[in-house]
């Protein structure tokens, strides 16, 4: 309970599971999934670096540098759980931040990497804290004058539809999809 906000505690009480991120001073940041099984508390944690690594540090193809600086479009990073989708997106946002001027708005559940403004103005919104749902945030994000929109994960058709519409209206949209192989993508 000490690591969770009152809203997260209520969500866990009501739904018996909750996702959130925590920072432990001197140790690091973690993405946490808290859940119940057979009446006991369980959790899974993943370490999140304090700063996003560069595309070069991740040894990702250099074409991603060009894609990250495009003026519009929809960029999907796909793969299985734990394959580096969020890390890759964070590196692309960092590349934009270092090499371009833009208004970037992220919608995440939870916020994982914390971005610091360099050349860009970056607003990071967390589902459940700063907005009710991905869909609600995406319906309103276009009024916030974004150049770049990052959607932490496309989980449903409403979010997918909103992502495509945002890209169609001239924005650069990044997101992730869980897939097991190329044909599923």
Language-model-detected regions and their locations in the chain:
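Switch II of P-loop NTPase G domains
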Residues: 53-57, 131-136, 157-159
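Structural motif
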Residues: 78-80, 107, 125, 152, ...
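Conserved glycine(s) of the Walker
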Residues: 84
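Aromatic/hydrophobic pocket-lining residues that form π-stacking "cages" and hydrophobic walls in ligand
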Residues: 32, 92, 137, 162-163
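P-loop NTPase switch/communication element
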Residues: 65, 69, 75, 88-145, ...
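Conserved P-loop NTPase nucleotide-binding/switch module
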Residues: 110, 142-185
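N-terminal "pre-motor" subdomain/linker immediately upstream of P-loop NTPase catalytic cores
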Residues: 1-80, 88
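Conserved NTP-handling cores and scaffolds of large molecular machines
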Residues: 3-8, 38, 52-56, 71, ...
